[in-house]
């Protein structure tokens, strides 16, 4: 949850960089517009959730500041195509988790508002799970770039998920 707002803003930025390359595909352009809207909604709602956590005494500023810094470093050093491939990979991971959230009972005992937030988010993640991948295939179909993006996303997410469990 802690990675969502900034991560989703990064996802939108990585897709938006290639927007002109998809202008001639109205269906993909429509899907991308929906992706932007959904990711923006997710970021706003999770940011509201952060406010509640902070009101309850959770200290998020240091963690989130370090996470934002690490995203900026990746944005500086990685080519845009690898950033997009990383977004496609992260969206794949998110879709797997979303599917699990929707099909399992692990959220049954969660606070009803938290459960609603996470299930709403999961449903929308399933809806746009392939958009970043479709853009990637259109602008940079290289398997090597896709694998590199998956490696970067895997290591990045594993590190930050592990860090987030210590809060």
Give, region by region, the residue ranges found by the protein language model.
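Non-heme di-metal
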Residues: 1-167
């Amino acid at each position: 949850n802690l990675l969502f707002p900034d991560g989703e803003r990064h996802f939108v930025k990585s897709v938006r960089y290639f927007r002109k390359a998809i202008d001639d595909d109205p269906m993909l352009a429509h899907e991308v517009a929906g992706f932007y809207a959904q990711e923006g909604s997710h970021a706003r709602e999770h940011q509201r959730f952060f406010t509640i956590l902070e009101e309850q005494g959770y200290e998020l500023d240091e963690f989130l500041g370090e996470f934002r810094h690490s995203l900026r470093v990746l944005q500086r050093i990685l080519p845009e195509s690898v950033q997009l491939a990383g977004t496609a990979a992260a969206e794949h991971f998110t879709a797997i988790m979303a599917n699990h959230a929707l099909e399992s009972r692990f959220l049954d005992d969660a606070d009803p508002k938290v459960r609603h937030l996470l299930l709403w988010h999961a449903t929308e993640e399933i809806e746009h799970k392939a958009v970043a991948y479709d853009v990637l295939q259109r602008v940079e179909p290289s398997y090597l770039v896709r694998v590199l993006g998956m490696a970067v996303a895997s290591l990045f997410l594993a590190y930050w998920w592990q860090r987030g469990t210590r809060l």
